[in-house]
């Protein structure tokens, strides 16, 4: 319930994504002026950047209802038909998270719904089977995905608007922390909020989570104001360093450096050495390490950079293998 209370309701309250918000204001005003539903919108970007929150904001700005579901939850066309025919009114928004995980059968039934607001359902089997056409309310579909490359071309072509969410700056993340603190009645200094923002991996969801944990530490210690010093102590207790690396992130780099001489080493070999699932390593940990310049993916395998050596306090080797 606390997260719902903190969720922004308008584009002005939504922090960050300024270029996207500027375009959305145009799209929303145009739709309202024409008294038409918003064009179908696809939002893509890494997890935790606020795609679901943005869908709620758009619905609130338009004054329409929002129906939230996910790709894996729509297993067959009947599931989709039930949502479209029974849960939506004219102008409402259907939000499908992880839309890249829609089944092929459900996706094919979504095409005419998006284009013509109709859906054909087959009733019965064999010679007695018959097709019923459902007339649907004119709705707007907002799809969200962290894997845009898995969106099929036919589905992608049916979105009138395709937008990318970017990582947040530490300053934007600090603004988010300050906003949550204000709404929760928690006193925190701007310096403390910025330290949280710097360790939040460019992700608002992480910033909100870290703020709640820092608040826990301050509350238990009886602190009335979360200062920079208190925030740093709490963040250190959580195992985060100044780049926001967690214990597991540092272990990945240490194994690369100490066991494999910085690499290159294959994903499967590295995962085995860490007793980690290769998918978790590749999708959860590596993107941030790569973005921070601590790790590289090469045709021969993973390589720790000179920056990784310096961050962990190891003297970098001399040679052409590692690049800063």
Swiss-Prot record:
Residues 242-324 are annotated as: Head domain (RuvB-H). It is found in: Cytoplasm. Its EC number is 3.6.4.-. Mg(2+) binds at residue 52. One of its GO terms (molecular function) is ATP binding. ATP binds at residues 6-7, 48, 51-53, 115-117, 158, 168, 205. Residues 1-168 are annotated as: Large ATPase domain (RuvB-L). InterPro entries: AAA+_ATPase, AAA_lid_4, DNA_helicase_Holl-junc_RuvB, P-loop_NTPase, RuvB-like_N, RuvB_C, WH-like_DNA-bd_sf, WH_DNA-bd_sf. It catalyses: ATP + H2O = ADP + phosphate + H(+). This is Holliday junction branch migration complex subunit RuvB. The gene is ruvB.
